[in-house]
Design a protein with these regions (language model features):
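Active-site-adjacent scaffolding segments
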Residues: 17, 26-32, 36-39, 43, ...
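A short secondary-structure junction motif
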Residues: 11, 37-47, 82, 107
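Secondary-structure edge/capping motif, primarily at the C-terminal ends of alpha-helices
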Residues: 18-22, 48-52, 111-114
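Hydrophobic alpha-helical segments that form the core
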Residues: 37, 90-110, 122-134, 146-153
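Short secondary-structure transition hinges
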Residues: 45-88, 94-95
Length: 164
């Protein structure tokens, strides 16, 4: 499962898709990366069907390691770019670049912290407000809508799986 997910990420890396764009500032690149990631249906379907990570500590450790090695440096580069171009105003680029992948891959994972779609959306809003207060106003209405759709689809898939 990890190798398939890694290959899918490499083939359709939303960070690489925005890195070289000169028409976007750092903040806009992060928002666009989130939009691209949310629109990647194959990866989302795989996430919905992924094994419960709490039952396999190796999967959990591998996910945390991949976040640290892969996602954190991408977030750091984009946050620093935003600091330089003035679209982001934070003293915590490194800390935020480490925290965002942990929050989005663990805290928002219903297999780790069971939650309804409404509860996940509430958590997502909390993350958005926290990031905003830290000088990284990344969650806009469009991204909030994408997250809501994703959480509702996940909840529907879980309900369907429970009926089978």
């Amino acid at each position: 499962m990890d190798a398939v997910g890694d290959r899918m990420f490499e083939e359709n890396n939303p960070f690489e898709a925005v890195m070289g764009r000169d028409d976007l500032n750092g903040l806009e690149k992060i928002r666009e990366m989130i939009r691209l990631n949310q629109s990647d249906r194959d990866r989302q379907d795989m996430n919905i069907q992924s094994i419960p990570i709490l039952k396999n500590p190796r999967v959990l450790a591998g996910m945390i390691d991949a976040n640290r090695r892969v996602l954190t440096p991408y977030f750091y580069r984009l946050i620093e770019e935003g600091n330089r171009d003035g679209s982001i105003h934070t003293e915590y680029a490194r800390e935020l670049s480490e925290l965002i992948p942990i929050l989005t891959s663990l805290w928002l994972a219903p297999s780790v912290f069971p939650a309804s779609a409404e509860q996940m959306l509430h958590k997502f809003r909390f993350i958005g407000e926290m990031l905003d207060r830290m000088g990284l106003p990344v969650i806009d209405e469009e991204i909030l809508g994408l997250a809501e759709s994703h959480f509702r689809e996940f909840e529907a898939a879980e309900e369907k799986r429970a009926e089978e």
